[in-house]
């Protein structure tokens, strides 16, 4: 029997369409929703799914939309603009909340509602895609094997081709500068500086510190007070980042310029095509250390990031509806570090082949 007890908001977005495909493949019939009927109705007609059109500022329609579902999956980014109203409604009407954010402020905000979510017997679980399931689970995995770990580094590859929504979110975040976690606190850092080399399953990459959701989520999952998150960049780009990023920060600090660029992104950027999604791989690395010098490293080899997100989001929703966790939780907090291995196509390594592990 098809399961139609959850709703996708922002169903017309690039990633949302992939999630819908996976949901249908796995026997679900989610209700699809968004702000604009001209964008939502064609998807409903193509898929045979029920739909509802509403703006998040319309409390009456929001209540109606949530009245017959057990879970909301928010796919409408940047989530800093959409998550609060949906979280408020989910708490009010006792509906589980999920999304695919990677935005640190959104994670910080969600954790403020943990006790209220627990009292209302629902879960608030942001980040059920590439942000942050693989890194969250891998961080928890290595942390569990290093007693009293004090330092956690996380790095990944695989964002060479990104969706309009991801790029718009990056434009939103760049003006704020970089972040790292030190002694349990988030502190500013210089975007584009601090590169290092990391060995991944496909070889060595240069990685550079970036703002990633794990700066907040991994702190809750592991309790480790010092966390840095990195992304792989092509070697030719690395020398230009310390100069280029400050220029972008100044440009995108102007709200008009930022909105123009985000509108251009909507028009021009299409996201990875089917061939890229089917054939590319992404890799995640995590390292935990303690003050005695004990260290544990591990790697994940996963499908292309958007393919992974589509599968992972639906598997997460299934797990939430089955296990019924309560509170504001990360995926690893709710389901454990091995949860990522339930997702099709994922491999975890404690050691790499000799040719790569130098």
What is the predicted role of each segment?
Residues 89-107:
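ADP-ribose/adenylate-binding Rossmann-like module
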Residues 53-81:
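Conserved Rossmann-fold cofactor-binding substructure of NAD(P)-dependent oxidoreductases
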Residues 9, 144-290, 294-297, 307:
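Active-site-lining helix/loop region of Rossmann-like oxidoreductase modules
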Residues 101-122:
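Rossmann-fold NAD(P)-binding glycine/threonine-rich loop
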Residues 6-26:
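N-terminal Rossmann NAD(P)H-binding glycine-rich loop of SDR-like oxidoreductase domains
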Residues 33-37, 55-56:
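N-terminal Rossmann-fold cofactor-binding loop
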